Amino acid sequence: MLSIELCVSSLEAIALAKELKVDRVEVCQNLESGGLTPSVSLVESAIDSGLKTHVLIRPRVGGFIYSESELELILREISFFNKMGVHGVVIG
């Protein structure tokens, strides 16, 4: 069975995803820069909508080779969003 995921970066996009009955959303910000980790409140809104919610974890624009401190930040964000109740995370 085909699953449909919609990248969302606003409250309006979350509402549209719910209206379209997509299988899940990927919450992110700054899509014009390739996407970054979204705000906590936007992720909360996606979870509260009842949609299956995945969160993009990307601390900065640019390449995907991270320093030790960036990797520590990524791990903390994954743990935090997991405790919030997201269904998964997206890296890259």
Residue map of PLM features:
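Alpha-helix-loop-beta-strand connector modules within alpha/beta enzyme cores
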Residues: 35-61
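Alpha/beta enzyme core
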Residues: 3-31, 48-49, 67-91
